[in-house]
Every structure is written in C-alpha cells, then in structure tokens.
Amino acid sequence: MAGPRVEVDGSIMEGGGQILRVSTALSCLLGLPLRVQKIRAGRSTPGLRPQHLSGLEMIRDLCDGQLEGAEIGSTEITFTPEKIKGGIHTADTKTAGSVCLLMQVSMPCVLFAASPSELHLKGGTNAEMAPQIDYTVMVFKPIVEKFGFIFNCDIKTRGYYPKGGGEVIVRMSPVKQLNPINLTERGCVTKIYGRAFVAGVLPFKVAKDMAAAAVRCIRKEIRDLYVNIQPVQEPKDQAFGNGNGIIIIAETSTGCLFAGSSLGKRGVNADKVGIEAAEMLLANLRHGGTVDEYLQDQLIVFMALANGVSRIKTGPVTLHTQTAIHFAEQIAKAKFIVKKSEDEEDAAKDTYIIECQGIGMTNPNL
C-alpha cells in the first residue's frame, strides 16, 4: 500500500498541531508513509503535547499503522499507514486537550473506512485554543454535511480546563465519495441565538450576565433581530469540573452559519466573556464571507478530497487555512486557487474565494 514517503516540515507556517492533524489524516487516507520533523519547533514547549500524541495514536489505530517517535516532547515522528477500518475507536487526551481536534484528525479518515465507525473521544469539550463542542455541533456539523455524509455527536459529559474529563461519541458511516460544495451566497442574517453556560460551582448568575452583556453588544450593531441567548446550568452528572462560556450563532437566509464564542477564566468578569463572544461574531459578519474564520481551515481537507470543484467565500484567509491548503496541495496534490472576491458588494471588504479542484478520493471498500 505504501507510496513514496512524504517529508513534512512541522515548523513552517502555522507551525503547530494543525500540521500534524492535516498531514497524518491525508497520509492515512492516501496510504502514504510520512515523516514530520521539527514538530512545534517554535512553540514555548516544543514537540508533541499529550493531545497531539492521543491524536496520532488514534490515527495509527484507525488503520493498523506503524508510528515511531511518538512520545511527549518528541519533535519527529514517522508514520506508515495501512488499511482504514471501521468499528469502535477510542482516544483519551488524559488532559483538557480538545475532543474537537481529535474529531478533526479522525473524521476524514473514517469516512473512507469499510464499515461504520464509532469514535469515543475523551478530553476537554469546551477548551481554550480549539473549537468548543457546541461550535462543532451547531456550525461545523450542518456545513460539513453538505459534502454528502452525516454524523451523530453525542455529548456524554462536558469537560473543562484544566481537568478535562469530557466525553463525546461520534457515529458515522462511510461514503463512496465526497460531493464538492459551493458556498458563495451569504444572504442576510435571519436569526441570532446561542447558549451561555456555567458548570460546577459557578453561580447561574454568571450565565445570565454573559448572555445579557452579549445581547447588549450585538444590539448596538444589529437592532432589528431578536437575539435569543439561553443561560444554561450544566447538569451535575453531565459536566466534570468547573467552567463557564458562551457561543452565539448567526444564521442567514442561505443557510450560512457564523459564530462567536468565549470561555471564562479565573478573574475575568462575566460581562467581558459575553462581550468578547459578541464582538467575535460581529467581526465575522462584517466581511462578506459565507463561513467564519474558524470554519475556513476545517473545510480544506474535505474540499481536497471531494470529487469536483468546491468554492467557499471567506473573510481574510487565516494562517491555519493557508497551512491546510499548503499541505493538501503537497500531500494530496489537490489544486487550490485563492483570489479576491469580485462581487460588487464585497469591493470594500476583505473578501476572498477559495476554490479547489478536489482529487475525487474514492472509497475502495464500497
């Protein structure tokens, strides 16, 4: 099954865990042996962290592959994939490492397995420096399913920094091929809704204050829509540890979804958390794109694998997206074109079209 070995420099561009996720997923799918060097070389703690290690081990187990150099602090790994298999797969970051990032690396792979898969993922569900599980379910899921597959995400327990302890179960069936997507029409915002949560010992008032501050902030800019942010106390048996946060979603007439989110930290008042999420949402609505800045890079691997030409309209192209494109071109040989949007209404905005000629990956098992 092995093709020529792909050599990846883990220190370029985004220079972090994302390079590992994109390169190992594509290596696994395409059956290409991989060596990644200089892993997280520029970070304050270089090399693999626990959450990267659990992602690598999961990919190895998904395809009965061989993995060398995979230990905490290691800056070089080699990976030799074999055949992707369905069934039950488990990954545990043993920290507050993000379950959503584990989904990012494993999901494209199990779409091309021989049978349905069940992914048991343990770690942080609402963690810093990663999508919150609510974002994954409320924004990522409905958009990524346009590629022609569906998945189910069951949140068993929520887990927060620093303990983790969350668990989600993702169920999905394989596909023959992925359809290309065309997301270029923004439409107008028709709904704004969200949830502000507290868990553990934090008082419910914190959730109400986050929600109220976010609503006030949004109203300054968008006056004609009801903003429905529900304050939520997470049930004791469904949350591990203490945490608070908020996610706000804007939905448009064409089915586009944008989000702003924020997590509470010790010593940061609730209003500030709510306002930060609201401002992030408003910033994502100001450009003429059809996806927000966090969805951009999560769609690149699927666009690269799809059978045909995909197009998405975005605001400024993030470093994560540029990095994902770089490795999708290097490893999968997909062809991307990024150009400024030529639409009249986008003229004054920083709006781009990302176009990809996908490789038409076909599931050999179906």
From Swiss-Prot:
Keywords: ATP-binding, Ligase, Nucleotide-binding, Nucleus. It is found in: Nucleus, Nucleoplasm. This is RNA 3'-terminal phosphate cyclase. SUPFAM superfamilies: EPT/RTPC-like, RNA 3'-terminal phosphate cyclase, RPTC, insert domain. NCBIfam families: RNA_3prim_cycl. Ubiquitous. It comes from Homo sapiens (Human). The lineage of its organism: Eukaryota, Metazoa, Chordata, Craniata, Vertebrata. One of its GO terms (biological process) is negative regulation of optical nerve axon regeneration. ATP binds at Q104, P131, Y294, D297, Q298, H320.
